[in-house]
Amino acid sequence: MAQRDYVRRSQPAPSRRKKSTSRKKQRNLPAVSPAMVAIAAAVLVTFIGGLYFITHHKKEESETLQSQKVTGNGLPPKPEERWRYIKELESRQPGVRAPTEPSAGGEVKTPEQLTPEQRQLLEQMQADMRQQPTQLVEVPWNEQTPEQRQQTLQRQRQAQQLAEQQRLAQQSRTTEQSWQQQTRTSQAAPVQAQPRQSKPASSQQPYQDLLQTPAHTTAQSKPQQAAPVARAADAPKPTAEKKDERRWMVQCGSFRGAEQAETVRAQLAFEGFDSKITTNNGWNRVVIGPVKGKENADSTLNRLKMAGHTNCIRLAAGG
């Protein structure tokens, strides 16, 4: 019995046609053209030749540069400028020069060579250097505790007392120096008068021996008379050393309202002055003190004026 291929018969006709057409297309595809191959080979050859030429040309340039460097010995040309310090060294004269200052612009001059204005300025600078440095007053600030504020106020008082003591000591020294100068001048006057009077006594000695004794008595009486003058000059010294022991108050305002007095007191406390408010007959007075001695009160007033409180006045503690 003959076998039949049922599978091939079962496949549809279009699928058979598709397979046959695809095989025909694969057979009909053209091969790579020889012209394209030749162009690609030419491009590749030119690229390789260009690379070779570039590398070879660089080597030649490096060889020429090396030859130029060898011929030049590797040194730059000499500068044409002749430096100024060489001329100064050639024309320098031996000897020690006086120091110069860039601000002055010349040699240091002696006091005889200075102008009157320069001398005045020099004397002023020397006087400023002799003065004692000013001590800055420590001002209590708002964030301080009451104990710290009290400590700062105590330090201020101690500093004021020290400054006052130094000032009084300086005054006493000046008075002593002036007193010593006066005593020296008073002692020198009778010593100069004594030889003047001894000359006529010696001239009269060969003629009148009796007149010799009065001359000595007169010469001796004058130094004795000069002694009371010196004692009389000693008298002003204890009066100058006496101090004002009274107590004074410094008033910086009198207000009807308590708020104004508190603001003034706060300003004084901020600037380092210990003040208080006293009420009398409806008036609120801002006072500082009591301060012992008129000089201390005056110094407090001066410091208040420097701080800007010009309306402060000095009052007696009982007034």
Curated annotation (Swiss-Prot):
Residues 172-221 have a biased composition (Polar residues). Disruption phenotype: Depletion does not affect localization of FtsZ, FtsA, ZipA, FtsQ, FtsL and FtsI to the division site. Cells containing low levels of FtsN stop dividing while their mean cell length increases. Absence of FtsN is followed by an inverse sequential disassembly of already assembled divisome compounds. Residues 242-316 form the SPOR domain. Residues 143-171, 222-238 have a biased composition (Low complexity). Keywords: Cell cycle, Cell division, Cell inner membrane, Cell membrane, Disulfide bond, Membrane, Repeat, Septation, Transmembrane, Transmembrane helix. Residues 55-319 are periplasmic. GO terms for molecular function: peptidoglycan binding. InterPro entries: Cell_div_SPOR-domain, FtsN, SPOR-like_dom, SPOR-like_sf. Residues 115-150 are annotated as: 2 X 6 AA repeats. Disulfide bonds join 252-312. The chain crosses the membrane at residues 34-54. GO terms for biological process: cell division; division septum assembly; FtsZ-dependent cytokinesis. Pfam families: SPOR. One of its GO terms (cellular component) is divisome complex. Sequence repeats lie at residues 115-120, 145-150, 197-200, 220-223. Its main location: membrane. Residues 15-27 have a biased composition (Basic residues). It is found in: Cell inner membrane. Belongs to the FtsN family. This is Cell division protein FtsN. It comes from Escherichia coli (strain K12). The lineage of its organism: Bacteria, Pseudomonadati, Pseudomonadota, Gammaproteobacteria, Enterobacterales. The gene is ftsN.
